[in-house]
A protein has these predicted regions:
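Conserved AdoMet/S-adenosylmethionine-binding subsite of the radical SAM
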Residues: 7-16, 25-166
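Glycine-rich active-site/cofactor-binding loop and its immediate structural neighborhood
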Residues: 1-7
Length: 166
């Protein structure tokens, strides 16, 4: 079952489970709720962190049922959304984020620094301000992975460090 590797043998050092890779919110509610229940059954786990781009690109995925299930959990629930530009943060996203916050889900953001998309100080400031308006804490800023066909988005480490320093 889910969580067997975390709890057999018991590893009390594990306090947080992260659902990531692909997109966990692409699961059906039934699948996701089953997974959450399995995680809740692990006594030493205190936090559930869900990484997802769907609240940004498909905010309708954030349903009342999903939010109620997360609020019902004894786990501290954190959702890390993936927004890269302030223009992604429209009214529907604001409503989805408000619903999550109303159900005690902490919201963090993960951005990828992309050349010619968000690699200016102005753009990053606008993104951060918009995230704060939506109740989302800017948290992670990554450089792009080296994947075939994406070299035109690459920002070098020195450029990234320079932007963060400003």
């Amino acid at each position: 079952y889910y969580g067997k590797e975390v709890n057999d043998p018991p590893n009390a050092d594990i306090k947080e489970i992260i659902l990531s890779g692909g997109d966990p919110l692409a699961l059906t509610d039934v699948q996701l709720f089953e997974l959450i229940a399995a995680i809740e059954a692990i006594p030493h786990v205190k936090r559930l962190r869900i990484h997802s781009r769907l609240p940004i690109v498909l905010p309708q995925r954030i349903t009342l049922e999903l939010c109620q299930r997360l609020a019902h959990s004894h786990l501290d629930c954190v959702m890390v959304v993936h927004a890269n530009h302030a223009n992604e943060l429209g009214k529907d996203v604001a409503q989805a984020c408000a619903l999550l916050r109303q159900h005690q889900v902490q919201l963090l953001n993960q951005s990828v620094l992309l050349a010619h998309v968000n690699d200016t100080l102005t753009c990053l400031k606008e993104l951060s301000e918009r995230l704060f308006e939506f109740g989302i804490m800017p948290y992670y800023l990554h450089l792009p992975d080296h994947v075939a066909g994406t070299t035109h988005f690459f920002v070098n480490l020195k450029r990234g460090q320079s932007l963060v320093a400003k």
